[in-house]
């Protein structure tokens, strides 16, 4: 294949040459990055199949060949200084393999294939843009043609549409509708008006109110079209209703979509459109796509030339790719023929093309290293030319070395190069091999696995090498929580970390960040600590008889992005199922644990802060109780410990409003569902204790990423995180209600029995007292008994009034206590006034806000919204308060009438006295007539 002609523009040629050099050095990733950054730059059109694409590809192939020669030239220099060696009677050796990282022919073909796909996608996107532009231009030309035919003044139509957009009043909609019906003289007139509405609604800068108000206008026009049988205008609106509705529906959020969806239900109910249009409106995305396809078919004369031009361009790119592949195949054939014609023991210094992957696979593996105790032999006859090359020490390879001694660099010469030592010294800057790998096509098993627990090779993540400096960036604190060396938990043995990982809080020399009376900032870690997660199977679980690492769980959940935290080690087991224990023992045992997502993330760095009960770092908290760590592990896993309320070390020394809110949780019973005041004296601090497996599982589940089984809500919290708790809460509440209903009849029976007993006792007492009393007393008593009988309404009529009143007061003695209990509720402290303050809550502003419908209507009618009501703001400013309780004769008086009028009060008092006099006169007259009758 001949070299294509370079561009005449020297600047463009320099750009192509420089880019070919950079891509040859840095690999195809650099080309991808350049294509993404320069996709809109016309100078880089050769990357997307432009005019000089073939010149760029040939230049790139030449640069890659030159890079291969430069990389292999230093490897041939030691062979020229060596004496000639006798040729063994063996088969001719294969030519020198290309250096690792140099693209082979297959890679070049794949790179060209990927480039072809990218260019094709880019051309398809450009084709779509040009087709859309061509269709829009054709539609605009059609509108201009209709405008010339009808001679309608569309500016007058716009003047009528503007009030509809601004206020959407009935008068504005009626004016727009009347103008449309008065100008709907012919089908072109109707198409022009409908097309104008479509252009206004589907414009890119149209806001939601504009679209919604104009759709209201269309709805009114459709209604009158059906009433007046205006078929031409109805047919014109049917053509444009799909893009109008679908564009407006897809451009807004869900709450605004409901307003538009109501119109669709109305249209479907009234039968304005046929079934095909209704189906397109019910699925807006599909309907909009069908409408665009209809436009392409309608304006095919404009669209076909654009599509044909792009198809030709894509076909030319495919042809160039096929020519490039055939050229590489021909060069490979020529190279193989040259190798068969000129067999030589040593490779030639000049290699024109990269080797095939098959040649790389045919090269024999490097010889195995001899034992270290054997002396270094002299150069054997079959020694390869690059055996004397000094080994390249790779960074990070020492991490996998399990031997205690240091390798002798002099012993590496006769041993031969390792699999990671075949890297040329002048490797390109983009080539970086962090781990030792074998050459292409060779699967060389390791002589001895670096880890005794893994026979298949080293794990993906290197060990920490007994140091946490590189991960955390600063030292950790002392093993004690509060800096006390003589604490009862400091004399216990360290956990077993299998000699690979050091204890996370051992061998420290600086004061702990959570100790002392002053808090220090948390650790500045680049990634979360791995010791908090589950342990790999080749390690033993640490003994949890050490003081726990302090945490602070009073934090918001982190950002739920997968990039924030590294993936978990592949050998680590999944976390424990997060099932939580309830102190009342009402855990839903029939519900299994939720599924856990395998790609969970590690705990957040902010979790390393201290809890408020972690020793004397806060001067107001008491010290941890002695011997808290003496429980065996199987006792610790049984659930929450029993808190001794008499322990003085658990009583907080600060006000209750300075304590964490979580300390209220033990005081609220599971069956409680109504407000009950809590006594601050009952609050106790949790005793210090090692974290249980359930607690660790809960923390792990809290910081794990969202999954299908555990979705998140809009604020980032787990959707069903408290499902088990709410389920247990509802069960306890239901059980309590059932018990209350079951115990209801028995309680009423006991009350009636006690009521009967008390009445019998009181009746016996009253009978005894009545015998010893005089007649006058009994008369007065009987008079009082008649009054009390009318008041008490007791069931028993055999006993006297005093006994009835006594028995009633005794049997009903529970009601005042209930009232007293309800009055003794502690009021909830106001949140606005702040905790511990006695100031009254602020008086809320009684004026109506802008979200009030009445406020909005008054603004539309010309009210400024700042002063009183009315155009001149002469009315009241504050809204009318709610009506107070009035007397019967005042309840029909209007708003603003003074109820404390002195004249009205005087008149009312006089009426009271007049009525009293009239009643007294009537009584006196009736008494006099009775007396006269008796005398007679």
Swiss-Prot record:
Q: Where is the composition biased (Basic and acidic residues)?
A: 561-572
Q: Which residues carry this modification: Phosphoserine?
A: 822, 824, 826, 837, 864, 866, 913
Polar residues bias (residue ranges):
395-405
Q: Where is this region: Disordered?
A: 77-102, 328-646, 731-887
What Pfam families does the database record attribute to this sequence? CID (PF04818), DUF7819 (PF25127), G-patch (PF01585), Surp (PF01805)
Q: Where is the CID domain?
A: 149-289
**Keyword annotations for this protein?**
Acetylation, Cytoplasm, Endoplasmic reticulum, Isopeptide bond, Phosphoprotein, Ubl conjugation
> Which segments carry the SURP motif repeats?
15-57
Q: Name one GO biological process term.
A: negative regulation of cell population proliferation
Q: Which GO terms describe its molecular function?
A: RNA binding
Feature: compositional bias, Low complexity: 330-355, 488-500, 551-560, 759-773
List Phosphotyrosine occurrences by residue.
Answer: 723
Q: Which residues cross the membrane?
A: none
Q: Which GO terms describe its cellular component?
A: cytoplasm; endoplasmic reticulum; perinuclear region of cytoplasm
| Pro residues bias locations | 81-91, 363-383, 534-550
**Which sequence positions carry the modification called N-acetylmethionine?**
1
- Subcellular locations according to the entry: Cytoplasm; Cytoplasm, Perinuclear region; Endoplasmic reticulum
Q: Which residues carry this modification: Phosphothreonine?
A: 828
Function summary: Involved in calcium homeostasis, growth and proliferation.
Under what name is this protein listed? Calcium homeostasis endoplasmic reticulum protein
Point out the gene that encodes the protein: Cherp
């Amino acid at each position: 294949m001949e070299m294509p002609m370079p561009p005449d523009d020297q600047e463009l040629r320099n750009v192509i040459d420089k880019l070919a050099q950079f891509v040859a050095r840095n690999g195809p990733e650099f080309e991808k990055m350049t294509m993404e950054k320069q996709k809109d730059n016309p100078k880089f059109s050769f990357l997307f199949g432009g005019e000089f694409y073939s010149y760029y590809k040939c230049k790139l192939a030449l640069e890659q060949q030159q890079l291969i020669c430069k990389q292999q030239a230093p490897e041939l220099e030691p062979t020229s200084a060596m004496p000639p060696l006798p040729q063994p009677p063996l088969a001719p050796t294969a030519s020198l393999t290309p250096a690792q990282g140099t693209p082979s022919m297959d890679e070049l073909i794949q790179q060209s294939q990927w480039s072809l796909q990218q260019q094709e996608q880019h051309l398809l996107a450009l084709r779509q843009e040009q087709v859309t532009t061509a269709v829009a231009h054709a539609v605009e030309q059609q509108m201009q043609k209709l405008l010339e035919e009808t001679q309608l003044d569309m500016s007058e139509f716009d003047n009528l549409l503007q009030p509809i957009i601004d206020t959407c009043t009935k008068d504005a909609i009626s004016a727009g509708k009347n103008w449309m019906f008065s100008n709907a003289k012919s089908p072109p007139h109707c198409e022009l008006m409908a097309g104008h509405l479509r252009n206004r609604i589907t414009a890119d800068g149209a806001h939601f109110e504009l679209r919604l108000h104009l759709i209201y206008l269309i709805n009114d026009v459709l209604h009158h079209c059906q009433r007046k049988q205006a078929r031409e205008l109805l047919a014109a609106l049917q053509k444009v209703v799909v893009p109008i509705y679908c564009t407006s529906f897809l451009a807004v959020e869900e709450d605004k979509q409901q307003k538009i969806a109501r119109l669709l239900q109305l249209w479907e109910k009234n039968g304005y459109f046929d079934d095909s249009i209704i189906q397109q409106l019910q699925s807006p995305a599909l309907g909009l796509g069908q409408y665009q396809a209809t436009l392409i078919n309608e304006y095919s004369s404009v669209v076909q030339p654009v599509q044909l031009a792009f198809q030709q361009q894509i076909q030319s790119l495919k042809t160039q790719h096929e020519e490039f592949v055939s050229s590489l195949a021909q060069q490979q054939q020529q190279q193989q023929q040259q190798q068969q014609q000129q067999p030589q023991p040593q490779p030639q210094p000049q290699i024109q093309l990269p080797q095939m992957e098959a040649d790389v696979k045919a090269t024999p593996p490097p010889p195995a290293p001899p034992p270290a105790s054997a002396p270094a032999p002299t150069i054997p006859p079959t020694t390869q030319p690059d055996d004397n090359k000094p080994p390249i020490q790779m960074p990070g390879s020492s991490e996998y070395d399990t031997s205690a001694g240091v390798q002798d660099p002099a012993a590496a010469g006769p041993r031969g190069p390792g699999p990671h030592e075949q890297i040329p010294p002048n490797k390109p800057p983009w080539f970086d091999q962090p781990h030792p790998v074998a050459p292409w096509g060779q699967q060389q098993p390791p002589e001895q696995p670096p880890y005794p627990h893994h026979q298949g090779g080293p794990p993906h993540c290197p060990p920490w090498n007994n140091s946490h400096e590189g991960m955390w960036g600063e030292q950790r604190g002392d093993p004690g929580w509060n800096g006390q060396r003589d604490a009862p938990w400091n004399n216990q043995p360290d956990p077993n970390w299998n000699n690979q990982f050091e204890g996370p809080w051992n061998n420290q020399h600086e004061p702990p960040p959570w100790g002392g009376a002053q808090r220090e900032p948390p650790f500045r870690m680049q990634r979360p600590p791995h010791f908090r997660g589950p342990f790999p199977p080749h390690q033993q679980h640490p003994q949890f008889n050490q003081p726990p690492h302090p945490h602070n769980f009073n934090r918001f959940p982190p950002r739920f992005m997968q990039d924030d935290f590294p993936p978990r080690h592949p050998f680590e087991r999944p976390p424990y199922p997060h099932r939580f224990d309830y102190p009342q023992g009402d855990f839903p045992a029939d519900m299994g644990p939720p599924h856990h997502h395998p790609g969970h993330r590690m705990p957040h760095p902010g979790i390393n802060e201290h809890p408020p009960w972690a020793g004397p770092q806060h001067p107001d908290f008491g010290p941890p109780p002695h011997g808290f760590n003496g429980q065996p592990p199987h006792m610790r896993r049984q659930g929450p410990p029993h808190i001794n309320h008499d322990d003085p070390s658990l009583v907080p020394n600060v006000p209750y409003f300075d304590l964490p809110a979580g300390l209220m949780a033990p005081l609220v019973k599971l069956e409680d569902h109504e407000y009950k005041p809590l006594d601050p004296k009952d609050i106790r601090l949790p005793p210090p204790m090692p974290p249980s497996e359930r607690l660790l599982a809960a923390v792990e589940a809290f910081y794990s990423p969202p999954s299908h089984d555990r979705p998140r809500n809009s604020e980032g919290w787990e959707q069903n995180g408290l499902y088990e708790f709410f389920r247990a809460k509802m069960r306890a509440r239901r059980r309590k209600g059932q018990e209350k209903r079951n115990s209801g009849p028995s309680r009423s029976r006991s009350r009636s029995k006690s009521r009967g007993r008390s009445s019998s006792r009181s009746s016996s007492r009253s009978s005894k007292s009545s015998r010893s009393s005089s007649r006058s007393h009994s008369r007065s008593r009987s008079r009082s008994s008649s009054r009390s009988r009318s008041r008490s309404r007791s069931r028993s009529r055999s006993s006297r009034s005093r006994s009835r009143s006594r028995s009633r007061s005794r049997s009903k003695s529970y009601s005042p206590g209930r009232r007293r209990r309800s009055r003794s509720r502690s009021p909830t402290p106001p949140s606005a006034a702040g905790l511990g303050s006695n100031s009254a809550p602020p008086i809320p502003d009684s004026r109506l806000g802008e979200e009030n419908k009445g406020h909005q209507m008054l603004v539309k009618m010309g009210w400024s919204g700042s002063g009183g009501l009315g155009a001149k703001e002469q009315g009241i400013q504050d809204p009318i308060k709610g009506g107070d309780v009035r007397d019967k004769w005042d309840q029909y008086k209007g708003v603003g009438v003074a109820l404390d009028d002195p004249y009205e009060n005087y008149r009312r008092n006089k009426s009271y006295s007049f009525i009293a006099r009239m009643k007294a006169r009537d009584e006196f007259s009736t008494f006099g007539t009775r007396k006269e009758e008796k005398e007679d």
